[in-house]
Amino acid sequence: MALQTPSFLLPAAVVVLMVLSSPGTEGRDSPRDFVYQFKGLCYYTNGTQRIRDVIRYIYNQEEYLRYDSDVGEYRALTELGRPSAEYFNKQYLEQTRAELDTVCRHNYEGSEVRTSLRRLEQPNVAISLSRTEALNHHNLLVCSVTDFYPAQIKVRWFRNGQEETAGVVSTQLIRNGDWTFQILVMLEMTPQRGEVYICHVDHPSLESPVTVEWRAQSESAQSKMLSGIGGFVLGVIFLGLGLFIRHKRQKGPRGPPPAGLLQ
């Protein structure tokens, strides 16, 4: 499947040359070199769920004409672009609108498109508390969302099942060296005993949203929990050591020693 390009580049160049060679332009000062540029841009959101086609025409570093599929027609940006806009809207508008599928969608789904366009990396999500203080003190919960691709992502905070919008602060998207992204979304809060906070993440790579939970509890409760975990770990270690010693003893010699050793 070959990559497709817009089929009216030559007519566009002809229109520009006709305008530049018209009698009204002969007496004007003009540069010796003429640079004509065409840029066809396809923007994709969630794969091909939403596609936007933008076509830009540039003469000597000044954009004079643009087609945007969200607008649906050619628009002149300078006087130079007016004849082209009128001509293209009469002669090529339906063809241009169709190229949203025949060019943009076709090229996305074609075998030559690099896998980076379809790359999906699931985000890693973690919650941390900025300051380890007791309950009923102002604090900041930080939801770290890392290593995801593409860039489109939605991160929300919930407290006891209700979405929190006040006190939510987010960083800009941070680019990693491997083309993935990360972002920090913080929630200003004053934790009360028993409250449950959830960081809720939506991303194109996920079949369902990722949620990470943080529970507000007192320092004594945290200490008891850590003590319980520590006691459990020590118990497992001592149990394993006891079983190991017993196993070694069971493998030892059984019955009386050889007669020669008793003399």
Swiss-Prot record:
Region annotated Beta-1, chain positions: 28-120
Q: Which GO terms describe its cellular component?
A: cell surface; early endosome; external side of plasma membrane; Golgi apparatus; late endosome membrane; lysosomal membrane; membrane; MHC class II protein complex
Q: Major location, coarse class?
A: membrane
CDD domains, per this entry?
IgC1_MHC_II_beta_HLA-DQ_I-A
Location in the cell: Membrane
Q: Where is the signal peptide?
A: 1-27
> What is a single molecular function from GO for this protein?
MHC class II protein complex binding
Q: Which residues lie on this side of the membrane: Cytoplasmic?
A: 246-263
Residues glycosylated per entry:
46
Q: Which PROSITE patterns match?
A: IG_LIKE (PS50835), IG_MHC (PS00290)
Gene3D superfamilies in UniProt: Class II Histocompatibility Antigen, M Beta Chain, Chain B, domain 1 (3.10.320.10), Immunoglobulins (2.60.40.10)
Residues annotated as region Connecting peptide? 215-224
Q: Name one GO biological process term.
A: negative regulation of T cell proliferation
Q: Annotated cross-link Glycyl lysine isopeptide (Lys-Gly) (interchain with G-Cter in ubiquitin) - which positions? A: 251
Q: Which UniProt keywords apply?
A: Adaptive immunity, Disulfide bond, Glycoprotein, Immunity, Isopeptide bond, Membrane, MHC II, Signal, Transmembrane, Transmembrane helix, Ubl conjugation
Membership in a protein family: Belongs to the MHC class II family.
Role, per record: Involved in the presentation of foreign antigens to the immune system.
Task: Give the protein's recorded name.
Answer: Rano class II histocompatibility antigen, B-1 beta chain
